[in-house]
Each structure stands twice: as C-alpha cells, then as structure tokens.
Amino acid sequence: MNKNPFIVCLMGPTASGKTDLAIALARKLPFEIISVDSAMVYRGLDIGTAKPNEEELQLTSHRLINICDPSFPYSAGQFYKDALSEIKTIEIRNRTPLLVGGTMLYFHILEQGFSDLPTADETVRKKIQEEAAQHGWAKIHERLNAIDPKSAARINPNDAQRIQRAFEVYETTGQPLSSYQSLKRFKALPYQFINLILAPENRSWLHQRIEKRFDQMLKNNFLEEVRQLYNRGDLNSDLPAIRTVGYRQVWKYLSGEYDYETMRHKAIAATRQLAKRQLTWLRRWPDAKWFNSEDKDLISQVVDYLKGIGM
C-alpha cells in the first residue's frame, strides 16, 4: 500500500451534475468510482435515484450500486465497511478511488471518523423553536416520529431539549439521530482526501433543475417503478429505501394519501430541502475545492486542478 494514498471525493447537492462529471473524470484519469449514496445501494430504485443507466455503467463501473434489496435497512456503518473493502480492492489495482455522491454522513465517517454529533446553525435552531412556539412540542414530536421513529420512541413528547436536538441533527444532515448511534467505533481512514464540491452559484438554477429532473422521472415511468415496489407486499413506508425522497411521496400517492399534484409538489419541495441540507453541511467542509456546476469548461477545470496537485 502506498504511503498516504489519495482518495478523491466528489460531493455536492442532489441534481448538481456529479454523476456526469464523475464519468468524464474516470475516462480521463486512473479513477474507479465508488458511489456514496444511501439510496443507490438498493436494487429496483433506479429512476427516482437518478442512478447511472446501463450504458453509463458499461462505460464506467460504479461500486456500491445495486448491492442490496429494498427490504434491507442499509446503514452508515455498513457503508463504512463496504467502502473500505472497495477502496482496498481499487488500491491493489493501482488505481485511485473516486468517491461520488451526496450522502454527507457517509463522507463524514470516512474522512473524520465519528466523535460528536454535528452542530446545528442558529437559523435551524430558531426555525424549530418558532414552530414549537406556534404548534407545541408534542406536535413537533409527532413530526419527529415521522422522520425518526426510533429516536421519537425514546424521547418524551414534552422533552423539548431532546426533541429539538433530534430535529436539529435531521435538518442539518438529512440523517436521523438514530442513524448515529452505532457509529462511535469508527475511525477516520488513513488516506489523503482530495475534496471536490460541485454546486451551482445560482440557487434558482438548482431549483429549476430539480423540478425538471423530477418531471422527467415521471415521464420515464417513475410511478410504475414505485408501484412495483408497492405491490411486492413485503415493503413498508418505514424502511430507509422507501423513505428516500421521491419514493416516499409516490408511495403516499399510491396509498391514496396524496393526489397526483400534491405528490409532485411535495416531492419537488422535499428534494429542494434535501439540497439545502446538503449545502449547509458542505459549506462547513474543511479543505475543499469548489467548482461551479454551471461552468461550460467544468471538466477541464477539474482535470487541470487534479493534475496540478499531482494526480
């Protein structure tokens, strides 16, 4: 094994163009791609996760895609073990791992290990407190139960401090507090991480792209994809796979809870909220080089940067 070997991490909010850039980079540099996405691990979750298609996968293979059934609650701890195994395999092949995705908790435990829970910014904290003042902490506890039933079961509906902390973690990271409980034994990996962040400078560009992408997913038979999962009979809305943004809303449409327009509106809104949480975390990421998704010469910019640091 090389001394302090490189790992390149390509991070960014959903719909920022990470997959296209990763494939382009892997065709120009000695990279092998590892997906860092908590939804792409599931077989049958293809259209709604914007998973690389068969043609793209033939051009450039992606590791940690389609590795488990949607009935399996894949965890951050499992990702840590799987990613480490794939990284070592790529090293043996004298290639460089290119980790690509938007599940920030997964990147975090690889690079920094796990010690303390992430802190919330003041805007998030204030928003939760204002909602509690308006609706009461018991109502906030009900909402917590919808996104993190394990934590909600452990927290009294009147325990404002613990409810707020659980909500802060989710709003800041997009991951439930309960997902952190088993991570304390994981240590940062002994590699030199090159962090690249891909995001647009214009937020409206991302919002428009999210809306257009979801509408295209609907045209590409996303409803039928979720219907096949729904009709299996062994899946439910509490599973991590079905709680994935987009799938959760279509599931509620199929169950009759939402009409079509409500489903579409809520799915787009939830995806934008996901992007916001991802950007909140990315802005705090140490030692990262930012690139603008909107730049026409994006690929050459990134290649030049990587070659300039010795890749």
UniProtKB/Swiss-Prot annotation:
GO MF assignments: ATP binding; tRNA dimethylallyltransferase activity
Listed Pfam families: IPPT
Known catalytic reactions: adenosine(37) in tRNA + dimethylallyl diphosphate = N(6)-dimethylallyladenosine(37) in tRNA + diphosphate
Binding site for substrate: T14, A15, S16, G17, K18, T19
Site (Interaction with substrate tRNA): T103, R125
Main EC class the enzyme belongs to: transferase
Repeat keyword on record: no
Binding residue positions for ATP: G12, P13, T14, A15, S16, G17, K18, T19
Region (Interaction with substrate tRNA): 37-40, 161-165
Alphabetical keyword list: ATP-binding, Magnesium, Nucleotide-binding, Transferase, tRNA processing
Source taxon at top rank: Bacteria
EC number: 2.5.1.75
Cofactors that this protein relies on: Mg(2+)
Xref: InterPro entries: Dimethylallyltransferase, IPT, P-loop_NTPase
GO biological process terms held by the UniProt record: tRNA modification
Entry's family note: Belongs to the IPP transferase family.
HAMAP family the record matches: IPP_trans (MF_00185)
Subunit structure, interactors included: Monomer.
Function field: Catalyzes the transfer of a dimethylallyl group onto the adenine at position 37 in tRNAs that read codons beginning with uridine, leading to the formation of N6-(dimethylallyl)adenosine (i(6)A).
Name recorded for this polypeptide: tRNA dimethylallyltransferase
The species this protein was found in: Coxiella burnetii (strain RSA 493 / Nine Mile phase I)
